[in-house]
């Protein structure tokens, strides 16, 4: 792992790089390395959803760091500043293997917090790594048996805009239409963390090949992911956004029947992008769970 030292205050994030499978570069933001407050507590590793990047965890990461924890928000392969897969392998198994590489490089107990794709990755990574390395798991609006219609809406949004936008304002309009329950920001400047300007157009900062591997559909792996979750002996928290069309109440009930030790919290003002929709409520729940 290499580090761009940046600022030295414990509450400030700095950019770090890990090595994934096949030596892929995985970039993250890190808070509180070597801070005395974090020495006896697990590291928190934040894993974003498909088409997102580490900046979706900016507020939550800062809140956890201000609580004294060692925190890392990681860009998955093919997302953000991490390397793209030369073979376009974005299967949950490949993503999980990358996370396991990061866990071994950290060499200390970790709490995994995963949203959507990151949650499925976390289930498999926690199962493979074992309870000595992964001590707790937080699943953010994802269960192995999620709703196909909600997943299809996400993919449709990503496919529709794969050719980029004329301007940041056009991108902001697309996001606003996709997330009508969110208040539209006054300025689209915040989207620059998720977009890259190339030849006069703004493109999402993820590999388009992420969408073109049908054999990597997590629905083909439902049984494997369910079995992995059922075999976990660590504390698990499932968080659902009440407005979500990806995780249904029936999906929650099914998961809790199969993983009865898991805890469940529903955020009334959030959808599938729960951490961003109601960050204060989300972060409060997560901080309390991690602190136990």
Locate the predicted segments by residue.
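Conserved hydrolase catalytic core segment
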Residues: 108-148
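Active-site loop/oxyanion-hole signature of alpha/beta-hydrolase fold enzymes
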Residues: 21-24, 29, 34, 58, ...
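Alpha/beta-hydrolase fold catalytic core
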Residues: 1-43, 66-69, 107, 287-292
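Conserved alpha/beta-hydrolase catalytic His-Asp/Glu region
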Residues: 166-220
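Conserved serine/cysteine hydrolase catalytic core
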Residues: 198-257, 266
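Catalytic histidine-centered segment of alpha/beta-hydrolase-like enzymes
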Residues: 267-283
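Serine-hydrolase catalytic-loop signature spanning alpha/beta hydrolases and amidase-signature enzymes
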Residues: 49-59, 71
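Active-site glycine-rich loops that stabilize anionic/oxyanionic intermediates
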Residues: 41, 49-52, 116
